[in-house]
């Protein structure tokens, strides 16, 4: 596809590089609105369902990932958008699960979920791992330290598998970027 401006109008692809679709909210109508506005491509990022309960097992995670993949296919078929999928365990899920599963079990489920998402990447069903990162709100020093250690492990896993990550981090500008740079340099 030739990408140019013709008659004052862009005729190339128009991407939403980070969209969550929630079937319990607007679902496909949000994708339809994007297409109606001229959108051509979306990067559908897995969104955990906080309202229907967080996963307690890797089987629960797999079921949630498959729902995201099914949703992507539905958007392709019904709306006609080009859809790329990003799968991964959200850091807020990990932090919330600490309070019910404990730090060790929550962390293990998170890392198992990363491995599962990377398997979907290797199969071609997903293009990246995400959202992974840190909680975007204040947590205890212990949880913050664990989040940083876990993020380093997740980054290493993605790097070794050869897939990009989509980060979920707090909004703290230069400090956040500097912190992430330190983690990347290890």
Regions found by a protein language model. Name each.
Residues 1-163, 167-169, 173-185:
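Mid-domain alpha/beta scaffold segments of enzyme catalytic cores
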């Amino acid at each position: 596809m030739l990408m140019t401006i013709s008659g004052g109008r862009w005729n190339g692809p128009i991407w939403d590089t980070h969209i969550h679709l929630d079937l319990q909210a607007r679902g496909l109508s949000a994708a339809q609105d994007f297409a109606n506005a001229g959108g051509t491509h979306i990067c559908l990022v897995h969104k955990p369902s906080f309202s229907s309960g967080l996963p307690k097992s890797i089987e629960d995670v797999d079921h949630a990932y498959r729902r995201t993949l099914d949703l992507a296919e539905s958007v392709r078929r019904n709306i006609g958008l080009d859809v790329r999928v990003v799968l991964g365990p959200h850091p807020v899920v990990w932090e919330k699960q600490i309070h019910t599963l404990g730090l060790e079990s929550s962390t293990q489920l998170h890392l198992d979920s990363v491995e599962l998402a990377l398997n979907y990447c290797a199969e071609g069903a997903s293009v990246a791992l995400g959202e992974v990162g840190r909680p975007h709100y204040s947590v205890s020093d212990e949880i913050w330290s664990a989040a940083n250690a876990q993020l380093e492990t997740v980054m290493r896993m993605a790097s070794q598998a050869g897939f990009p990550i989509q980060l979920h981090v707090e909004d703290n500008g230069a400090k956040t970027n500097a912190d992430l740079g330190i983690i990347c340099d290890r």
